[in-house]
């Protein structure tokens, strides 16, 4: 029996997964993230016409981290030809940790996909080349999508990440040695870490990313960020590469394109219907929200939704 989407359903799902809190681990390699209370839990759904359903801590903002990689790729697709992007970044799953250097060396500086650190750094490098103020431009895009000018970066998180950026800097310099990085490394790292340090709530994330369920168009339908084909391509990349080394498990359990961040957020797309955003800071072994993934799995089951 397929269940109707409403706030009561979302509340019920959160109660089902709340016992999982305590079984994961909050990201601690970024000190500012380690301070987030582990018991936070929220979910929100935004339909194509802008209707919002929500439960739990869905209005509380948190660091979106790698979810921002979808936004930076979207922005790059509006500024570059697809050929220009995909000759510098691949479309394949990595099978390696998100910040691994080994594969990059073997494959001569071309990252496997835009949703690992390596690929996202190349995308940020491309944005740095085309935009006079890439940090401000991404903020403007998000504020316009969400219709909220108070969305901002957390300077403390950005600074904390920059202070622990040796590995990402090494990645960028290695790509530079292969001719796949054009701008000053530290400047691009500042942009990249600010993107990761954007703060949004589940409600805001669901509103923001509904364009991926709406063939590249914003909620009103009046503005196309990307083409319908590009929206499908981003969704395809999220299925194969959006959940670090847990993409196969997520596709198996949830059956939706998804992108996670180590802040505990996940977005998931049901094409032509809605976008879901969940948040629970404790992560599983792959770096994905443990309770958040379980909540999406239950929602998919109870509503009978899957792209497969």
Curated annotation (Swiss-Prot):
Keywords: Hydrolase. InterPro entries: Beta-lactam/transpept-like, Glutaminase. One of its GO terms (biological process) is glutamate biosynthetic process. It catalyses: L-glutamine + H2O = L-glutamate + NH4(+). It holds the Pfam family Glutaminase. It is an enzyme of class 3 (hydrolase). Its EC number is 3.5.1.2. Belongs to the glutaminase family. This is Glutaminase 1. It comes from Yersinia pestis. The gene is glsA1.
